[in-house]
Amino acid sequence: VMPSLHDKIYAHSPLPVQNWLISLYGLKLYRERYGPYYDKELKKLRRQRLVDPDAAQLNRLNRFLHFCQRHNRYYRNLFKRHNIELPLKHLEELQQIPVLEKETLRTNPDIFSDIKAPIIGSTGGTTGTALQVRFTVEDYQARMAHLDYFKEQHGFTKGMKRASFTDRMICPRDQEEPIYWRYNAPMKQMLYSVVHFHERTIPDYVDSLNTYRPDALDGSPSAMIEVAKYLKETDTRLTFKPIAIFPTSETLSPWGRALLTEIFQAPVYDQYASSEGAPLVTECKHGRMHLHPETGIIEPGENGEILVTSFTTHGTPLVRYRIGDRMTLSDETCPCGHSGTVISSIDGRQMNYVETPEGYKVFEGDLTATVAVLPNSVLQVQVLQHEVDQIEMLYVKDEERFEDEHETILKREVERLFTPNMRIRLKNVPAIKKEPNGKIRVVKRLHV
């Protein structure tokens, strides 16, 4: 949740102080996410009028490309080199602009715009490549307005109570007291630690949920499914009925969705976003996933691999960015009336995990996030679990940026996710081996 959560001060503070620190950080996030830009975008979404969607999208695209030309050296040079003349006259002309690869985003300092963009997003992604991007406050608030508008359409409004299942280290790994959650008061958000999930601890989570009685659940669907399985197997009753469930980050299987709907007696509405700032895709009441065209353009690429152009990435502009996820786009329309392109399937978001000797799960998102402490000096990582108490992190270093102490720093970050019972080894390799399908599996459990 916040960089300082791993600090010794936080880890050794009494629980009420940890809640206070979480809320303090929550206040910082609240001020970043909610403000004049958020209010403006949400009002615009609420009063949407019927317009020519292609013409509106071309206007948005040209505004964004003009910004890139004025404020971003990388794109200014790119447009000049490839004779890109603005404004574009048709949306199809976007294809004249070369594809932006992850390696360029990671290594080229010219990709950062010459404007104030104080909010940093970092990702390990589904490919294990570590990246840092920057957002303006306006970008951040516009994205938040779209996410809140999506939830609003399903009955959940800002200020209602949330239960969020997170793989961030909000509780010390070796905590003995069975309170694996912390409260973010400014956002009325109870944060539940996925890191501490275990068949022994799930009853504690259920008791907390029944006491807190949230209006909605969000975050890791894997964790919510574990709770649902426990409730079904033990015939335990909930004392609340959420308005909706909003899973994030992972691909939700049909059986997982059915189980959540059955046990929590609430509809499940999926969403797609990314730490890099990809255009938003959300699910409507008819079960279809729609692109929010105000946030960008998604182009189908080879083998379903998409290219994204995101209008909410002024700090680190993404134009025809190969994000590494796969989607199937559809020409169908939807009874809900949403003008955004229908996305019939999304692939590439499956989350794997390492299982600890104590029976906990450490998810791939947490493992890849460890490289974010380094200055883009690691190109890629892969975690191999050889035994229940032994993992090996393979990493590919950037020869120009990597320094000797970076391995020590990285190992320390990985160690924070486990108890001393886990033996951890780091190994520098020239490349990570791809699977037969051409993709890299970030986590491989070899002992099962």
Kindly label every feature range from the protein language model.
Residues Y180-W181, T234-R237, K285-H290:
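Short, hinge-like loop/turn segments at secondary-structure boundaries
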Residues L217, V319-P420:
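AMP-binding/adenylate-forming catalytic core of the ANL superfamily
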Residues I243, P247, L252-C334, Q350-N352:
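Conserved AMP-binding/adenylate-forming
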Residues M190-S193, Y269-Q271, I424-V429:
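General small-molecule cofactor/ligand-binding pocket signal
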Residues V1-S122, T129-M144, D148-K161, R168, ...:
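Nucleotide 5′-phosphate-binding alpha/beta core
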Residues V195-F197, T201, P214-W255, D270-E276:
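Adenylate-forming
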Residues Q141, A163-A223:
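AMP-binding/adenylate-forming
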Residues K161-A163, L307:
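Conserved beta-strand elements of the Class I
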